[in-house]
C-alpha cells in the first residue's frame, strides 16, 4: 500500500489514463491535468506525477522497473492526497493478431509472481526547488540497474516511424500500406535517400 498525503490543497500535475473501462493497459501518453488535489478526478493517473508544494515541487516516479507492475495513483476524493494502485498479475491473456499484442482477460488478487532473488523497483520522491532542476535530476538513473548492453556510443538521436503510424498514414504508394514488409522497405529506402 502506498499513500502520499499533503497538509494543504496543493496543485497536482496528473496525466490520467485514457481508457475508463480498462485504465491500466495503455500507452502511457496523455496531457497533464493541472488541478488542486481536492478536485482531482477519481481516475487513475500514471507516473511521473508532480505536486507543487509552494517552495518545492515533489515528483513521484519510478526507477529500475522491470517485470514488475508500475504504480498508478488515484485521488483520495476530497482529501489532500493520492493513493497508489498496482496492476494485478494476469491470470489469463489473449492475443490481438492484428496488433501482435497480448492483452489481459482475467487477473489474480496479487501483483507479482517472483522466484529466486531479484531486485524490485524503486519508488522515488524527487524534491526540487526550481523547475529547471527536474530534468537534470539523475536520481532515476542512479537507482537503475547497470547497463547490460555494453557500448552505447552507436546510438544516435534521430527520427523514428512507428508501425501503427505507418499503417495509418502512408498514402500514394504502389502497395497496400500497413504493418508489412513493403511498408518497412519503403521507410528504409526513404531514410536511405534522405539521410
PLM region descriptions:
Residues 111-194:
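An acidic-aromatic substrate-binding cleft motif
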Residues 1-147:
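N-terminal accessory beta-strand-rich subdomains and adjacent acidic, glycine-rich linkers
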Amino acid at each position: 500500500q502506498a499513500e502520499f498525503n499533503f497538509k494543504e490543497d496543493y496543485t497536482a500535475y496528473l496525466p490520467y489514463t485514457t481508457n475508463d473501462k480498462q485504465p491500466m493497459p495503455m500507452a502511457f501518453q496523455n496531457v497533464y491535468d493541472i488541478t488542486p488535489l481536492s478536485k482531482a478526478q477519481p481516475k487513475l493517473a500514471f507516473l511521473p506525477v508532480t505536486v507543487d508544494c509552494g517552495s518545492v515541487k515533489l515528483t513521484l516516479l519510478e526507477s529500475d522497473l522491470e517485470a514488475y507492475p508500475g504504480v498508478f495513483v488515484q485521488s483520495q476524493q476530497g482529501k489532500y492526497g493520492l493513493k497508489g494502485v498496482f496492476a494485478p498479475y494476469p491470470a489469463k491473456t489473449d492475443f490481438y493478431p492484428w496488433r501482435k499484442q497480448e492483452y489481459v482477460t482475467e487477473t489474480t488478487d496479487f501483483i507479482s509472481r517472483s522466484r529466486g532473488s531479484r531486485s524490485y523497483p524503486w519508488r522515488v520522491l524527487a524534491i526540487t526547488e526550481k523547475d529547471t532542476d527536474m530534468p537534470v535530476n539523475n536520481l532515476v538513473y542512479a537507482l537503475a540497474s547497470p547497463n547490460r548492453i555494453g557500448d552505447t556510443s552507436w546510438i544516435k538521436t534521430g527520427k523514428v516511424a512507428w508501425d501503427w503510424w505507418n499503417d495509418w498514414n502512408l498514402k500514394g504508394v504502389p502497395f497496400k500500406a500497413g504493418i508489412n514488409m513493403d511498408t518497412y522497405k519503403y521507410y528504409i529506402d526513404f531514410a536511405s535517400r534522405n539521410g
